Structures are given as C-alpha cells and as structure tokens.
C-alpha cells in the first residue's frame, strides 16, 4: 500500500508541476494556475478515499486540460506607459485632436496608436497606403495599437527564452495576456519631453524582425530615454511578411505607380510623410529627422537611403546589424524577377490565381503560409520605391543621407546558426566552398580547422562576417566617399545575450535600467556612452561630444569597439571582407 501511495502521489506532483510550468510559460491567467493546484488537492482526496487510481488519473488530465483551456491568456492592447496614467493636453494634427499620457515620473509625454494611414484591409490589401481618416472626436492615444499580422510565436518557447536569457522575466510574470495583432496595423507612437518645445531633433525608428515579425513597442527601444534628452522618438508598425512584401504582376497592373512587393516599405515611407507633416505640433523639427533601425529595420534604413521617394525627407541615418548594400545581399533583398517568382509560389500554396482570390482569404491564413522558398520577407527593386539595388545606387552616388552611423555585433549571427546544419571538421571546408566558391581557399588558409571545436568556432566568425559585417563594410566604404561615416563593432558581454543579435539595443537606446539584474556598473557606463553617441548623432550628424572617447570617422580605416573598453580598432574581419569582394 505504501508503494502504491508513493507512486500515485509522485505521479500527481510531477504532472501538476508540468501543467503549472506549461501554463505559467503560456501566460495563462493566474486564476488558472491556482485552480490547477486546488484540483490536484481534490484529486488527492478522491484517491485517498476511493483508491481508484485509474479514474483519478483520467479525471486529473481532463480537468487540467479544461482549466488550461478556459484560462488561456486574453488578447489586449498594451498600455502606452501604465494603466490609469495621467492624460496630456490636446494636440491638433491634420486629422484632428488627440491626447496622450505621461510616463510614471511625468517627464515624458507618450502618444501611442496614432493612425498614419487607412487600414490596409479589404480592397486596400496589397495597395499603396492611403491617407488616414479624420478623427471622430478627440483621439485617445493611450494604448499601442495591434502589431502587424504575423505568425504567432509559440508563447511557451518565447517565455522560456526570455527566462533562459534573463530577459523580460518581469514581463513574463506580470503580463498574463497576449498583445493584439491585426491586419489593421498602420499606427505610430511618439515620445516627447513634457511641455511645449520647438525644433527638437527627431529619431524615426524602424523595428526589426526579418520583415516578418516584430512590434513597435519593445522595451529595448523604448523612446523615453531619448525624450528626456530633448530628442523626439517615433516608432511604428508596418505590414509584414506576405501581407507586406508579396510581389505579383497583376498587382503592379492595379497600381497607378506600377509597384508591387514593397507594401511594407511604402508603409514606412507613409509614416515618415506623416511625421514630416505633423511633428512640429509635438515640438519636433521636420528638417532634422534621423532614420534608425536594427536588423530588418536597418535593412529598411538602407533602402530608404537609396529610395527616390525618401529624397530630402530625412537628414541622417543609423543602421544596426543589417545591410543590403552588398552586390549580393544575403537577406532582406531580392531582384524583382525572383520576388514575382516567389509570389507565384504563395498563390500555388494557397490555391489562388488572382489578387481577388487572395483578398478573400483571412490575414491569418496568409501570414501563416510558408512557400517552397520560405517566407516572403525581402524588399525588391520595384521601379517605384527602389529603382536600383542599393549597391547600384551607392555606386552612382544616389543616396539620401548626409551622415551615417552604422555597425554590427560580434556574435550577430550565432542565434541564426542554431537553424543551420551542424558544423564539424569533416564538412567545414565544403560549407565554406558552398558559400564562397571563389575565395574559399583563401578563407581556409586564414581559418583552418583541424578539430570539430575549431570548425565550429571559425565557421561562426566567417558566418558573422559574411552575413552581417560585410554589408556594413561595403556600405561604409561607398558612403564614406561623400559623407561622414561612423562605424562601430559591439562586443560587450553580460548576463543576458551579450553581443548576439539585438544585444546592443538597450545600450544604444538607454534602456538597461528596465532589467537592472542583467547589468553591472560597466554596462551602465557603456549604456550612458552609447546613448550619448546616438543622441549626439541625431542632433548634429556627429556622435562625438564632451567627455566621450573620440569616435573617428570611418575614412580613418578603423571602427569603434563598444565593449568592456571603448577604443578605435581595425575591424577584425577586414581580411575576410577583402576575400568576399571577389564573390
């Protein structure tokens, strides 16, 4: 009897713990987690009284599953600062009057969820963004509006990742809900200093996410720190994936501009137009706008620097961890013929022939569809938004920015390598040859691999240099012929993700204080320095300032290492870049 009791209680405890952990990571309501514990106690009493273990186990699984279902996290809009925040006064823009909210210490005004275009739904799906409608009454800009339609990240995996890397643990504990997403997503957010101002510089930030995922309100690029330093910070959502970058000759025929495949990018330009037309009402200077972005947002900045539609609409550019200026960009860009071919594969997958057939489908079905070419997540030379590849535009001197701050992280590609096949000493040379058929022999001389450990280590270096560093190198070299270029190399390690992809964001935008348990005094000092560099650049086109280590322009041939030490160095991957030039 004792063995039977021990076995049942052990099984009950184990299953309860597994369900509790799953529901916690899945962000189920706290009431659901409590109810599971109560149910486990009742099951224990039932077994103790009846000794009917089979029935008890069946009842346990049925009840646990039912509780898990009825306590699923609800979708809701994310508050701009906090629930019940104090409201600002009214501001009048072209569409009407609106109010925002103050942050907790009252030093920053936040205006969230301002429509910059009509909802791209129904017949407006896959069309250039249209002007927003007039407001009915006063718009309450106090919550972030839905993020763009995209494939939902598995909540359990997402929360587990946050906890594993000690990122956003507080968010996982507090936020027992799911942020809303919708095809109706064309909204922007503005952070500004409290009270009236005039002619403040503006940072126009484009979020990343491979052009398929992401949202405008992520904590790492929250704009309050910039607003406290007299810079207005704007970010926004735009169409993603197939809804934003699907190319179809029939859609080009529908367009008065003959465009297709660039709807998400045209959203970005539309948001920029709205900011230029209205930012003076918030105290901003429409003639001193810096466009900024990370990852796919950085690729978008790169495209905006060469788009004829963006000419004269911004002044400076900040680019972090992605560039499409190489002759053969490894991601985020493809030629129009390839884009149209990829678009056809989407129609084949969904059983549609014409745009009208696709417009009848739900946004969820389209966003969740993979083609044989993968997801639709690349910009293209549509002849309207981009008339040439960025490389061709820079070669011709046809770029828009007056100064450029650009760089990447030491381990930018490490996460992406987890999706690659395993590298060892036996397949190392073949993998290098496949990626760099002209220069692989020189690469193998620079980075030979006699052991599996050497193969893994060296392949990471080569992958990071080729996938992330090289595009920034080409961009820097071409741009520096005509303008000041400031290039960085981020190497800081910490308790979180260190110098992996997105690792620089909380430093550059002044947000390490949102997760103080991840950072020490050296991180705080680096954050203060990087934020000062970025803000100075947004104000003047030069990151240097009083008390900061000198950041030499790239024409010196060096980059600024941002790590445990801040110093000018030669790019450690420069020899690889010269080999990549041959491809």
Describe each PLM feature range.
Residues 298-310:
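Short glycine-enriched nucleophile-adjacent loop
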Residues 149, 166, 469-583:
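Mobile gating loops/cap/lid regions near enzyme active sites that modulate substrate access
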Residues 257-280, 337-341:
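Alpha/beta-hydrolase active-site loop
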Residues 282-295:
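Alpha/beta-hydrolase fold nucleophile elbow
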Residues 174, 277, 311, 320-430, ...:
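Substrate-access "cap/lid" subdomains that shape
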């Amino acid at each position: 009897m004792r063995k039977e009791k021990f076995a049942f209680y052990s099984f009950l405890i184990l299953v309860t713990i597994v369900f509790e952990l799953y529901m916690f990571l899945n962000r189920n309501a706290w009431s659901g987690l409590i109810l599971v514990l109560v149910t486990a106690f009742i099951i224990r009493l039932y077994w103790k009284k009846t000794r009917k273990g089979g029935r008890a186990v069946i009842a346990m699984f049925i009840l646990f599953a039912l509780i898990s279902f009825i306590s699923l996290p609800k979708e809701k809009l994310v508050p701009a600062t906090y629930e019940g925040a104090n409201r600002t006064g009214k501001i009048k823009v072209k569409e009407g009057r609106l109010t925002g909210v103050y942050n907790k210490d009252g030093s920053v005004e936040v205006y969230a969820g301002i429509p910059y275009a009509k909802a791209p739904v129904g017949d407006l799906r896959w069309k250039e963004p249209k002007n927003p409608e007039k407001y009915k009454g006063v718009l309450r800009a106090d919550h972030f509006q839905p993020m763009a339609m995209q494939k939902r990240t598995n909540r359990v995996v997402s929360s587990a990742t946050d906890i594993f890397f000690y990122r956003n643990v507080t968010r996982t504990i507090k936020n027992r809900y799911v942020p809303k997403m919708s095809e109706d997503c064309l909204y922007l957010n503005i952070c500004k200093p409290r009270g009236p101002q005039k002619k403040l510089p503006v940072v126009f930030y484009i979020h990343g996410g491979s052009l398929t995922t992401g949202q405008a309100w992520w904590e790492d690029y929250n704009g309050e720190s910039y607003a406290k330093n007299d810079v207005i910070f704007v970010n926004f959502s735009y169409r993603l994936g197939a809804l934003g970058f699907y190319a179809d000759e029939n859609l080009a025929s529908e367009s008065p501009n003959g465009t297709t495949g660039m709807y998400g990018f045209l959203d970005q330009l539309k948001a920029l137009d709205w900011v230029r037309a209205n930012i003076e009402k918030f105290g901003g200077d429409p003639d001193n706008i810096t466009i900024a972005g990370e990852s796919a947002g950085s690729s978008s900045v790169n495209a905006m620097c060469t788009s004829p539609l963006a000419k004269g609409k911004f002044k400076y550019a900040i680019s972090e961890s992605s560039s499409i200026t190489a002759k053969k960009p490894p991601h985020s860009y493809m030629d129009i013929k390839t884009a149209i071919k990829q678009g056809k594969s989407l129609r084949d997958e969904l059983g549609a022939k014409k745009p009208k057939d696709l417009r009848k489908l739900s946004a969820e079905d389209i966003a969740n569809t993979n083609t044989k070419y993968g997801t639709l997540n690349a910009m293209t030379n549509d002849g309207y938004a981009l008339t040439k590849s960025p490389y061709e535009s820079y070669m011709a001197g046809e770029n828009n920015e007056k100064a450029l701050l650009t760089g990447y992280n030491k381990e930018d590609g490490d996460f992406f390598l987890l999706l690659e096949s395993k590298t060892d000493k036996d397949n190392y040379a073949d993998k290098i040859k496949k990626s760099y058929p002209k220069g692989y022999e020189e690469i193998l001389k620079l980075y030979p691999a006699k052991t599996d450990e050497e193969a893994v280590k060296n392949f990471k270096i080569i992958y990071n240099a080729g996938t992330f560093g090289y595009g920034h190198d080409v961009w820097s070299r071409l741009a520096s012929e005509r303008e000041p270029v400031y290039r960085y190399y981020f190497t800081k390690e910490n308790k979180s993700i260190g110098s992996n992809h997105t690792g620089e964001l909380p430093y550059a935008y002044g947000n390490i204080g949102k997760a103080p348990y991840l950072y020490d005094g050296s991180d705080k000092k680096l954050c203060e320095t990087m934020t000062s560099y970025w803000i100075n650049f947004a104000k003047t086109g030069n990151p240097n300032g009083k008390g900061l280590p000198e950041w030499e322009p790239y024409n010196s041939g060096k980059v600024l290492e941002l790590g445990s030490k801040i110093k000018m160095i030669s790019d450690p991957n420069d020899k690889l870049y010269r080999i990549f030039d041959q491809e």
